[in-house]
């Protein structure tokens, strides 16, 4: 049995600090039940392609997608870009061309986390491993439709942003495998008229 185990790296593996954006399509199972399979497949293909292009336009790197969920990452010092990408995704998906033709209104849940990870290519695809990746999945699952939640590290990293504002959730959020998380924030884009008043 021991012969089947992969050897550990002989030298320390380099880690990096990164931000992760996870977005998930609300109600995708219901859509899969309602739509003909070819329509559903075409919708998901357009959905995923849109998010790939949107996240890359904001400087992110898409790591993977699993059906109705997409995960991307940014260097930790680009937390503002990561949050803006997550927020912009809501509007872009709501305007998805094929969804409009099918008479559908699409909504997302989103989350942004940050921390230490290891990245590398597995099977030709870039992957990331570390607690922030798992946290992003769980935090996204805890968001309400239309909501983008961020952890305290991300909120702190964006504190000086003139384009973002954050509201602390009124109650702790219970997340599977993480327990009760007290400092979770909802991210919002600052409206232009508010920016003009500040200026």
Q: Where in the sequence are the language-model features?
A:
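Intrinsically disordered, glycine/charged-rich C-terminal tails and inter-domain linkers
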Residues: 1-6, 10-13, 145-199
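Catalytic NTP-binding/metal-coordinating core of nucleotidyl cyclase/transferase enzymes
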Residues: 4-81
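Catalytic-core segments of nucleotide cyclases and related cyclic-nucleotide turnover enzymes
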Residues: 118-144
């Amino acid at each position: 049995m021991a012969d089947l185990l992969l050897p550990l790296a002989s030298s320390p593996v380099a880690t990096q600090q990164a931000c992760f954006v996870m977005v998930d399509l609300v109600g995708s199972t219901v859509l899969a039940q309602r739509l003909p399979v070819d329509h559903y497949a075409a919708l998901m293909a357009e959905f995923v392609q849109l998010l790939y292009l949107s996240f890359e336009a904001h400087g992110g790197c898409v790591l993977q997608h699993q059906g109705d969920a997409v995960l991307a990452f940014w260097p930790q010092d680009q937390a503002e870009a990561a949050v803006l990408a997550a927020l912009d995704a809501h509007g872009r998906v709501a305007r998805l061309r094929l969804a409009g033709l099918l008479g559908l209104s699409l909504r997302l849940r989103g989350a942004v986390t940050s921390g230490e990870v290891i990245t590398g290519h597995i099977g030709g695809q870039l992957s990331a491993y570390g607690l922030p990746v798992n946290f992003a999945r769980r935090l996204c699952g805890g968001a309400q439709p239309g909501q983008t939640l961020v952890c305290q590290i991300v909120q702190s990293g964006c504190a000086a942003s003139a384009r973002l504002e954050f509201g602390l959730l009124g109650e702790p959020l219970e997340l599977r495998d993480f327990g009760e998380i007290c400092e979770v924030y909802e991210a919002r884009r600052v409206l232009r008229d508010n920016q003009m008043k500040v200026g």
